[in-house]
C-alpha cells in the first residue's frame, strides 16, 4: 500500500514539474537587442564623437548590435584630432563619398575585435587577432607601452561595459585593402586606359602601308566632335558597344555610368532621373559609349521634386524624354567649383549641351550657380554628387528647357514701284509756233 502511494505521489510531482516548465515563457536572449548599458551606447555618448559620427554614416549600427548580441567586443577608438586634423583631406573625402561606403565600413570594422581584451589581458608577446572586417591586428607591448599595430594605446580601458570595452588610440588604423582602393582612385588606375591603335591600312594603288596619322597626345580630347559620335537619333537602335579590346583598350564607360547611376540611387532624391536614363531611354548605354571613346560629360541632374512637375504633354511627344535629358548633359567636365568660379569671373557663361544647337546659360545667384532663363531656371544645390574625372553629376532643383526662339517678324516685300511716264511737255515757244503755223508744221504733227 505504501509503495503504491509513493509511486502515485512521484507521478503527480513529475506531472506538475512538466506543466510548470511548459508554462514558463522562453527567456532566451534575442541577439541584436542591446540595453542602455551597452558599449555601443557608450561609444555614441563618449568623447569619441568623430568615430561615432563615422559609424552612423557607414550604417553599421545594426551590424554592431548583432555582433554585441553574440559576443563581447573590443573597440580601438582614435582620438578626435586624429580624424579632424591629422588625416589626409583627400583620404577623408574619399571615405565620405557614397560610392566608397564599403571602404568606410571595412575601415571601421578594422578597429573592432570580436572578443574582450582589457589592458591586464594584453599579450606580452606579439599576437594577432582577427577583426570584424576579417583582417588581423597585431597586439604588442613595447617598453611598457601597449600598441595595436603601429598605433599607441593612449587611454587603455577608457570605457568599460558588460558587453565590451573601448581603448583610446593615437591615430587611425588603415587596412591594406582600403589603402589600395584609395591609391587606385587617386591615380585613376581603375578608369585610365591606353589609347587604342587602329589596324594598319594598305594603299590599294601602291600596295604599301599607309602612313599613320599623327599620334594624338595622351589625354587629348577625341578628334571628332561629340555630336558626330552620338547615335543618330532616339528613334533608332541604341548606340553600339565599344569595339573589341580589354579594359586597357578603352575607357570603361559602361562601368563608370553604372557607378554614377548607383551613386544617384544611394544618394537619394534622384530616382526619377536614374529611371529615365536606364529604363525610359537608352541614354545610359549611349553615355557609356561616349565615355569609352574618351569624351567627358557633366550631367545636371534634376531631383525627384523637379521631375514630378513635368506634365504629360511634355513627355508624350516622340523623343521628348531624350531631348529633355540631352539638354541637361554638357560635353565638358565641370565641377561645382569650376562653374562657380566661371560665373563669378564672367558673370554669365553659356555651356554647350548635347541638344545641339541649344546652350545652357549659367550665372551667379545667391552665392550659387543658377541655370536657365527666368521662371524656368534651376539652382545648383547638391554639388559634386559624383566626380571621377570623366563624368561629373551636379544636382539641380528644376528641369531646364531651352529658351524659345521668337520668330523674326516677317518683312513684307515692298510693292513694286510703277514708274509713270510723264508726257513730255513742249516748250512755250514750240506751242506758240504750232498755234501760228497750224498742223502743217511737221513737229506739231
Swiss-Prot record:
The keyword Amino-acid biosynthesis does not apply. It comes from Arabidopsis thaliana. SMART domains: FAS1. Residues 1-23 form the signal peptide. GO terms for cellular component: extracellular region. May be a cell surface adhesion protein. Its main location: secreted. It is found in: Secreted. Glycans are attached at residues 72, 279. InterPro entries: FAS1_dom_sf, FAS1_domain, FLA15/16/17/18. The gene is FLA16. Residues 35-173, 257-400 form the FAS1 domain. Pfam families: Fasciclin (PF02469). Keywords: Glycoprotein, Proteoglycan, Repeat, Secreted, Signal. It comes from the Eukaryota. This is Fasciclin-like arabinogalactan protein 16. Coiled coil: none annotated. Belongs to the fasciclin-like AGP family.
